[in-house]
Structures are given as structure tokens and as C-alpha cells.
Amino acid sequence: MEKVPGDMEIERRERNEELSEAERKAVQATWARLYANCEDVGVAILVRFFVNFPSAKQYFSQFKHMEDPLEMERSPQLRKHACRVMGALNTVVENLHDPDKVSSVLALVGKAHALKHKVEPMYFKILSGVILDVIAEEFANDFPVETQKAWTKLRGLIYSHVTAAYKEVGWVQQVPNTTTLPATLPSSGP
């Protein structure tokens, strides 16, 4: 964190770099194996996200009351949202060669979550950390450092595009409510 005038802390933003050809191939190879089980992987990601960061459930009237991970796994609404999340990620991963398409897709996601759903953008960073954790576990024996770095770079790129969309629509950060903020952030990198 770095200080800016007014004693506000902001995250230092890394340059929004595109992935290299080798990084794109590493991400796409990993993703192809994950996406083969799209719904189950998506559900596992969302269940972990909501169990570890229950404040995120506040945006989902259909399952915000659920505490039991098994109940969440069985929820048709959660499963449907998991498929939407995985579908959006799939579009991004399939189009890593086309920065304009990636930017367009993530702008739509960001604007919808800012304007329609009123989701705090920090949840994108948290969710992407959970995604990286699940990928690392799925490929524990086959997730080399280069691939981890490529996914971490993609995570930063996604967050950068989504938060740019929030800024574009004039998002004003909501006043923090200690009952809705996550206690900790995921352990994954930037």
C-alpha cells in the first residue's frame, strides 16, 4: 500500500500488461482442463467464496441466507450463477489474443455489477483469489511457477478492467460497514 494526499491508502496498480504468447497458452491449457467440468468447478469456487467471505452473499437474495456448503452446492440459483461466472471467464480466456474483446467483456461485467447489482469491486479481487486457489489445488502436481505467474497476471488484468468500468460509470465506494466487510483477503498474489 502507498499513501496518497489525505492519508488515504490505495493499492499500487501494476501496469496493465497483456499476457505473452507463452502465458496465454499456459492459461488456456489449464483452463481447458478446468472448463471440462465447468459447472462443478464453478460451484466449488462460489461455495468457497461464500463460505470464506460470507459478506459477499449480501448481493444474492436467492442464497444469502444459506450457511451450509452442501445446501449452497445444491442451490439451482448458485449453480446457474456459477455457470455464468465460468462462461464469462471462458470468454476472456478464449479471447486472450484479442485485448479489445477482453476489455469489452470485462467492461460489460464491471458495469453490470456496478450499476445493476451494486457489488463492491473488492469482491472481484477476492473472488479471483479464490479462483486461483482452486486452480492451484486442482493442479497441485501440475501447476508450474510460470503458469501460476500467468494466472496471477490474468487476475490483475481482469481486476484492472473491471475497476476501470466501475470508474467509468462513476462508482462511489460505499461507506464500509464492519458487518459486511470480509475479515481477511485471500492469500493469493496481486
Swiss-Prot record:
Tissue expression remark: Widely expressed (at protein level).
Pfam families: Globin
Record entry for activity regulation: The nitric oxide dioxygenase activity is activated by a reducing system composed of cytochrome b5, its upstream reductase CYB5R3 and NADH.
Region listing for Disordered, in residue ranges: 1-21
Glycoprotein found in the keyword field: no
Sites where the protein binds heme b: 81, 113
Keyword NAD: no
Organism listed in the record: Rattus norvegicus (Rat)
Listed name of the protein: Cytoglobin
Function in brief: Probable multifunctional globin with a hexacoordinated heme iron required for the catalysis of various reactions depending on redox condition of the cell as well as oxygen availability. Has a nitric oxide dioxygenase (NOD) activity and is most probably involved in cell-mediated and oxygen-dependent nitric oxide consumption. By scavenging this second messenger may regulate several biological processes including endothelium-mediated vasodilation and vascular tone.
Single Gene Ontology BP annotation: negative regulation of hepatic stellate cell activation
Encoding gene (name): Cygb
Locations listed in the record: Cytoplasm; Nucleus
Taxonomic path: Eukaryota, Metazoa, Chordata, Craniata, Vertebrata
